[in-house]
Regions:
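Conserved catalytic submotifs in the C-terminal HATPase_c
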Residues: 71, 96-106
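Conserved micro-motifs of the catalytic ATP-binding
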Residues: 64-69, 107-110
Length: 226
């Protein structure tokens, strides 16, 4: 593994304990007025998102161990789970989230936790780069023998070099995305790593007013019970 990436993974592991302490500290505050309760909720939300990314980075470290089994996964249930977790954040930041499921095939071959992280990181990226009072989009649809999950934002254009890496199917390491201020590219790096592990097609489409990120997974032949 790249030395720079390895250093990032090591640093992330060291951050896990203090982030957990921060979360517990925020949860321990009681009897607050409305304004302070809002601050507390944001502290908890920020710490939980940071812990999730640390956990994702830890998973990247373990991908070579082939511990993540592939199995039939209900794609809509995964997306619903992510939306439920992030909807508060979208509303807090005055963003809308449009959701459309048109897929007939509900089961895909994937690892549930890795797929959840892919959708989570793409959606978090979309929320961050869509402007205030604009919307992000989550669309799930059939594409021949696959199911495609598309996350669309209306933010600054994705730099061409990052787009080429996504088109190739994976990002080598987190990079600063100059046209998207404040980005480390960490979420895209995580999503591309997990997608590659699952042998999923992953990529991006550049628009004049934003970017669509997608991941495609093979349809499971198992009959869905959902």
């Amino acid at each position: 593994m790249d030395v720079e990436v390895d250093s990032i993974l090591l640093a992330a592991h060291e951050l896990k304990a203090p982030l957990a302490v921060l979360r517990q500290l925020a949860l321990s505050f009681d009897g607050m007025d409305t304004a302070n309760e809002r601050i507390r909720s944001e502290m908890v939300s920020v710490s939980e998102r940071a812990i999730r990314q640390v956990n994702d980075l830890t998973r990247i470290k373990r991908l070579d161990e082939r511990l993540f089994d592939m199995e039939p996964v209900a794609v809509r249930a995964v997306c619903d789970d992510v939306v439920k977790e992030l909807m508060y954040l979208f509303r807090f930041n005055q963003r809308d989230l449009y959701i459309k499921y048109s897929n007939r095939a509900n089961l895909v071959i994937a690892n549930r936790e890795l797929l959840r992280s892919v959708v989570y990181n793409f959606l978090l990226n979309a929320m961050h780069y869509s402007g205030v009072e604009t919307r992000s989009e989550l669309v799930v649809k059939d594409k021949k023998d696959k199911v495609r999950i598309v996350i669309r934002d209306y933010g600054p254009a994705l730099p061409r070099d990052v787009w080429k890496e996504m088109k190739r199917g994976w990002i080598k390491k987190p990079t600063s995305i100059a046209m998207r201020p404040g980005s480390s590219g960490l979420g895209l790096f995580i999503a591309s790593k997990f997608s590659r592990y699952m042998n999923a097609n992953v990529g991006a489409v550049r628009h004049r007013d934003g970017t669509s990120f997608f991941v495609e997974l093979p349809i499971s032949k198992q009959v869905s019970l959902f």
